[in-house]
Amino acid sequence: MTTKAALVALCLPGMAQAVTCRDDIFEDASYSVCEVAPGEDLRLFLNGPDGPYGSFAALVTGLEPTGLTLDFAMNAGMFHEDLAPVGLYIENFQQKARIVTSDGPGNFGLLPNGVFCVGDSFAVIESRAFKAAPPACRYATQSGPMLVIDGALHPSFARESDSYNYRNGVGVAEDGRAIFAISNDAVNFHAFARYFRDIVGVKNALFLDGSVSRLYAPELDRDDIGFPIGPIIGVVTAKD
């Protein structure tokens, strides 16, 4: 089965799940992809009672008293040494960090950057457009650069770039699914963006981070560990 055929098959009636994860290959590089159906309980997490969670294990433990199970999670944007978000961060409608629209150093400042918003639907929105007309986001995280903007690759990406890294990002399909991908091999931005546009098939996609990229996906037996991370995005369900 081809990659695109597999994506279609996952969306056939009667086969829908809250989160569906799979492994994939694109241009000899390995990727893991998790798709979140519209209406699922997708949340952002940063702090627990004792400070930043910093890891999937701490988040799983923190959710236990609430009766919720973590079905999928991924690091969700760049952060400072104290794990605070670099850009806009909204949790349960409360803005915890402001939006940053000026250019600057590093990947975050490589404009255009963008915001992933969880509201009545999922959306990836360029940061300045978001600031000009902010939607109602229950959760939102800003990162950068944008990978795909209205079907076009970020103008700064070069196919021949020798900047290779592990990377993760998110895009939104036309049917409303949020599609998260992480590279299991080092890839450059051009390849990563083309994977989202040409294989995943989204018109807008946002880079979340690189090198610290992590995935929690029990379906794939993934529970990545490493240095502490800042914002975490994940799907939760009530325990049976």
Tell where the protein language model's regions lie, with residue ranges.
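Short glycine-rich loop/turn motifs
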Residues: A29-V33, P112-N113, Y164-G169, I229-G230
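Conserved, well-ordered active-site substructure
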Residues: V86-S102, S156, E160-Y166, V172-N204, ...
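Short acidic-glycine loop/turn motifs at beta-strand connectors
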Residues: V36-G39, C117-F122, I149-D150, V172-G176, ...
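Active-site-adjacent helix-turn-beta-strand microarchitecture at beta-sheet edges
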Residues: A84-F157
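Sec-dependent signal peptide recognition
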Residues: M1-A9
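Hydrophobic h-region of N-terminal signal peptides that target proteins for export
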Residues: A9-A18
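Zymogen propeptides
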Residues: Q17-N107
